[in-house]
Amino acid sequence: MSGVYALMDTLLPFEWLHYTFMKNALIAIVLLTPLFGMLGTMAVDNKMAFFSDALGHSALTGIAIGVVLGWQSQMSAMLLFGLIWAVLITFVKHHSKMSADTIISVFSSTSIALGLVVLSRGGAFAKYSSVLVGDVLSVAQGDLLALLLALVGTIACWVFLFNPLLITSVNAPLAQSRGVRSRMTEYAFTMLVAVAVMVSILWVGVMLINSLLILPAAASRNVARSAAGYMRTSVIIALCCGVIGLALSYYLNTSAGAAIVLCCAAVYFVTLPMRRK
């Protein structure tokens, strides 16, 4: 990593990047934000705006289960439970007459309550409360490899999922008539979102994860004129807001995650008048 740090010092001679923890945070943001930029487009198109919120809340339950089972890795517990929760939400949505937002709300409330009950036993919740707000400045060198693998894996899966997801979101009956397995595609997409959410939740936080997924895509939808442009613009907005928000958090001495989300929100409101009627 010393070579990467030296290159950053040469190419980005900014005061806020003099510190190693800020360099790690910047690398993490460059790896994380494209994930949310890509996945957010389909989440918005398929009216799954609160799906990541439910998965974020389930992170608490994942940690709780890991504590009960004596697991050392919080990430493993969160990933396992997040994937199970994503599959369950999708399964119930397809086998229930209730609306999707109602089902997601039920799962979201259940997961956060269950996690709080388990983690608060004996007053131990304070030990894990940092997951609520996250801290991208706490990213260590060892975490960057996991983020890189998540990005590469997501892009690889996205190559195969993008067209089926796109046609399904536009016209599900047409997709099925063309041999697209819409339900399996949706399961794969929700599991992909679960991985992205769980990998980043410790640094983004439960309270902000949904905003980071939805706001760049929503802003992009205001200005994009094609499916490819929609995704590309969403990734660019997420990446730029991530870097700008991190820099602002340094100079304003505030939360990096919140600053990033506010930048995304500002872009959304600026682009809102550009949206076609």
Please report, for each region that a protein language model flagged, where it lies by residue.
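Membrane-interfacial amphipathic/re-entrant helices at transmembrane-helix boundaries
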Residues: 1-33
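Transmembrane alpha-helical segments in multi-pass inner-membrane proteins
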Residues: 203, 209-258
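Membrane-interface helix termini and inter-helical loops of multi-pass transporters
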Residues: 8-18, 125-139, 247-248
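Mid-bilayer segments of alpha-helical transmembrane spans in multi-pass integral membrane proteins
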Residues: 87, 91, 109-124, 139-147, ...
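Structural signature of hydrophobic alpha-helical transmembrane segments
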Residues: 21-33, 72-84, 148-152, 198-212, ...
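Small-residue-rich segments of transmembrane alpha-helices in multi-pass membrane proteins
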Residues: 58-68, 106-118, 138-139, 182-194, ...
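Short loop segments and helix-boundary regions at transmembrane helix junctions
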Residues: 41-125, 220-232, 249-253, 275-276
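Membrane-helix/interface signature in polytopic inner-membrane proteins
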Residues: 156-189
